[in-house]
C-alpha cells in the first residue's frame, strides 16, 4: 500500500515517469497487486478482515494509475461495507473475523482508514461511513488522557495503539463529524500522541522506533510477534508516515503551529468515568466497558 501510494503521489504531480524507470514500473505493476492476497471470489487469503481496506486502497490506486478499471475497487469497497452491516450493523464496528466476534483496535480504526483512503483517492464517504466514524469517535473520546497513550488491549498494539487515534481523529476532523470543542481536544490529544512517539517509542541511540527488546534496536518497548525484527525498516517508515500525514491534515485544518488547547486537562474531567459500547448483539453479545 505505501509503495503504490507513493507512486500515485508522484503520478499526481506529473513526476512518475521521471522518477521511476519503465522497466521498474512494469515490475511494480505486477507486484503491487491486491490479487496477491485476495482470491477471485474476493475472500482474503488467510488474513484478518482489516486487509479488505488494504486491498481496496491498492485497487483504487491501480485504477488512478491507469493499471486497471474501477470495478475491483468498487467491489472491494462494497465487500467491506457489507461486512460492517452483516456483523455489527447499527453498532458500526468491524469484526476481524467472519462473524466470530473478534473486536479489537482494528475494529475501531478501520472505518477511519476507509474514510482516509476514500478521500485520498477522490471519493466521497457516504453518510453511513460518517455515522460509523462518529461511533469510533464516541469510543475514543473517553479514552483521552494527558500522556498520549492509546489502546492497551488487542493484537498488534504497541505504538500502533497510539497512532490508531491519530487516523480516526483526523478523518473525523476532515469530515466534520466532531463538534468544534471535540476537534480542538482531538488536536490536543494528537499532539500528545506524537510527543509520546518521540519521547517514549523512539530510541535516541539508534534513531529507530523501539519495539524489539534489548537489541541493537532498542531497550524493550515490546509489541507482539506479528511485528518481528524483520520488519524494523518497514515499521519505521509506516509509523513516521502516519505521524507526518495526520499532522499535515491538522495543518490543512488551520492548526499549523498552534499550541494545544490549554483547557485540555480540565476538559478531561468532564468526560464520563465509564462507558458501554456495543460491538454486536446476538447469541453472544460483544462490547467494551
Language-model features: where?
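Extended polysaccharide-engagement surfaces of secreted carbohydrate-active enzymes
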Residues: 146, 166, 170-289
